[in-house]
Swiss-Prot record:
It is found in: Cytoplasm. One of its GO terms (cellular component) is cytosol. It comes from Neurospora crassa (strain ATCC 24698 / 74-OR23-1A / CBS 708.71 / DSM 1257 / FGSC 987). It comes from the Eukaryota. This is Formate dehydrogenase.
């Protein structure tokens, strides 16, 4: 029989009171009865950090590991080396940057890494649009003013703008980035731009009313609002540093619901405090959970606002949790049945090789460059 380890976040009393919070340790993605009825074992924990964590102890003899972007259990090369029985790593959600994919390819004959592709793209896209509006309309300081018992229209309005007539650009135009652009179309923005190595079709560009910019700095210089919708990998880690942020328009807004490590948190906080960035918002942090002294918890613009940060929640609405719980079960069922008939789009690593175009192309390019250098 198979041991399944799930690293999920603690929902506390909320997880106990709301069974639809499937991504919590209280509700375990709805998997326990289904697995135990088949004779399998499910171990669930939220203890994932520090020496001798439950995650580390239980991983050693687990055959399947379930992790989540909202409370990531980092599958480093060192951890994978100790996981002698591990065959399948499932992300309940999307994004497998918490897994050392090179090590997964080489461990135990190749660990399959899969995620529930598409399960929360609508949820994240809606959150992006909400965050843009919250920042541009200066909602948070205005709401805080009311809660404090004050009434000062001018104080709120002096940093409030319309989204109409603004230039908005997305870094990445995959499943989420494209949906963000589609949701922005009715707002009559001056222009919708995107930066991505792979262009949309001419038909999609015409339908959405967007335009590709081949150079990232060129796009940033034009945008009033920039939203990050690309995956985290070696080329995007720390991408938005002090130098790149300086290329953005003074007084622009930056939204990040992709991954916290794509930005340098200290540089974003500095740009916000100086007013170079009028606002920063999103739900992704590095590390996660964010420590109490994380600079993006407290950084504000010179007007006393511009911070729209929340916990990592954009992709874990109750509707999204239904989808990624069902998708996680389907992936595990495919493994347990021996059929391994996974949805191709869910596979990140399979059979000791990359199964996704972007990762595969990137790794092959690195290998080719190394071979050429040594020749």
């Amino acid at each position: 029989m198979v041991k399944v380890l799930a690293v999920l976040y603690d929902g506390g009393k909320h997880g106990e009171e709301v069974p639809e919070l499937l991504g919590t340790i209280q509700n375990e993605l709805g998997l326990r009865k289904w697995l135990e009825d088949q004779g399998h074992t499910l171990v669930t924990t939220c203890d994932k950090d520090g020496e001798n964590s439950t995650f580390d102890k239980e991983l050693e003899d687990a055959e399947i590991i379930i992790t989540t972007p909202f409370h990531p259990g980092y599958l480093t090369a060192e951890r994978l080396a100790r996981a002698k029985k591990l065959k399948l790593a499932v992300t309940a959600g999307i994004g497998s940057d918490h897994v050392d994919l090179n090590a997964a390819n080489k461990t135990n004959g190749g660990i399959t890494v899969a995620e529930v592709t598409g399960s929360n793209v609508v949820s994240v896209a809606e959150h992006v649009l909400m965050t843009i509006l919250v920042l541009v309309r200066n909602f948070v300081p205005a709401h805080e003013q009311i809660q404090e018992g004050r009434w000062d229209v001018a104080e709120a309005a002096k940093n409030e703008f319309d989204l109409e007539g603004k230039v908005v650009g997305t870094v990445g135009v995959g499943r989420i980035g494209e949906r963000v652009l589609r949701r922005l179309k009715p707002f009559d923005c001056k222009e919708l731009l995107y930066y991505d190595y792979q262009p949309l079709s001419a038909e999609k560009e015409a339908e959405i009313g967007c335009r590709r910019v081949a150079d990232l700095e060129e796009m940033l210089a034009q945008c009033d609002v920039v939203t990050i919708n690309c995956p985290l990998h070696e080329k995007t880690q720390g991408l938005f540093n002090k130098e790149l942020i300086s290329k953005m328009k003074k007084g622009s807004w930056l939204v990040n619901t992709a991954r916290g490590a794509i930005v340098v948190k200290e540089d974003v906080a500095e740009a916000l405090k100086s007013g170079h960035l009028r606002g920063y918002g999103g739900d992704v942090w590095f590390p996660q959970p964010a420590p109490q002294d994380h600079p993006l918890r407290y950084a504000k613009n010179p007007f006393g606002g511009g911070n729209a940060m929340v916990p990592h929640m954009s992709g874990t609405s109750l509707d999204a949790q239904k989808r990624y719980a069902a998708g996680t079960k389907a992936i595990i069922e495919s493994y347990l049945s021996g059929k391994h008939d996974y949805r191709p789009e869910d596979l990140i690593v399979y059979g000791g090789d990359y199964a996704t175009k972007s990762y595969g192309e990137r790794e092959r390019a690195k290998a080719a460059a190394a071979a050429a250098k040594s020749a």
